[in-house]
């Protein structure tokens, strides 16, 4: 198995393991929990202090090797799963000067070149959030936004970060997340 294919498998497996752990907690009758394995998250109920769980979306800058140290946004969640795919930690620069991420584009079988910096997905299960995040990264911004509009009707919500023309971050998010976000200039509901 190639290292790229192995990486895709490992990332998808992580979401599945989060779901298995969450299911085990529910079978034990635990109603309030958060399971987090390397940023793949599933939560139910509320925090001990009350209110929804709060999960950070990292700032996707090159070389950000410190998970959780640079939070761009906090999203409040309950009874769902959350996963982020991005191109800011594991990538290389190709011969044409393009950033090539570790995400494999299933249409080509090659590493994806994406104009998305990160794709955060909220879904019923972590395996779904993981898979959709990878898909959105492979699709790129315009096609990902188009697909996200369709998937929002099925309860799949997104928070995409791109780099604008001036280099500042631009965010595209599902309208259903609006109430949980601290919106700034450069934020766009899809």
Where are these regions (language model features)?
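Short, ordered coil/turn segments that flank beta-strands lining enzyme active or ligand-binding pockets
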Residues: 3, 95-96, 106-108, 165
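Active-site-proximal beta-strand/loop segments in catalytic clefts of secreted hydrolases
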Residues: 36-37, 57-59, 85-86, 124, ...
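Low-complexity, Gly/Ser/Thr/Pro-rich intrinsically disordered linker/tail segments
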Residues: 157-190
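Single conserved hydrophobic/aromatic residue that forms the stacking wall/gate
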Residues: 1-9
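Short acidic, glycine/serine/threonine-rich loops at helix termini
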Residues: 44-49, 173-174
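Single conserved position on a long alpha-helix in the C-terminal lobe of the eukaryotic protein kinase
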Residues: 47-97, 105
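Proteins synthesized as precursors that undergo proteolytic processing into mature forms
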Residues: 37-39, 98-161
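Cysteine-centered nucleophilic/redox motifs
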Residues: 11-43, 140
């Amino acid at each position: 198995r190639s290292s790229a294919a192995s990486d895709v498998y490992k990332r998808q497996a992580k979401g599945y393991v989060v779901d298995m752990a969450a299911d085990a907690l529910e079978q034990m009758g635990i109603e309030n929990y958060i399971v987090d394995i390397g940023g793949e998250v599933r939560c139910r109920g509320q925090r001990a202090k009350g209110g929804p769980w709060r999960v950070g979306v990292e700032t996707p800058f090159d070389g950000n090797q410190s998970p959780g140290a640079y939070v761009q946004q906090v999203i409040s969640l309950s009874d769902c799963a959350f996963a982020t795919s991005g191109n800011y930690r594991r990538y290389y620069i190709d011969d044409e000067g393009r950033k090539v991420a570790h995400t494999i584009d299933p249409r080509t079988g090659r590493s994806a070149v994406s104009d998305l910096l990160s794709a955060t997905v909220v879904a019923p299960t972590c395996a779904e959030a993981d898979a959709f995040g990878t898909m959105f990264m492979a699709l790129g911004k315009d096609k990902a936004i188009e697909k996200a509009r369709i998937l929002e009707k099925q309860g799949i919500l997104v928070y995409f970060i791109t780099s604008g023309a001036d280099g500042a971050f631009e965010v595209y998010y599902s309208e259903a997340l609006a109430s949980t976000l601290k919106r700034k200039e450069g934020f766009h509901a899809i």
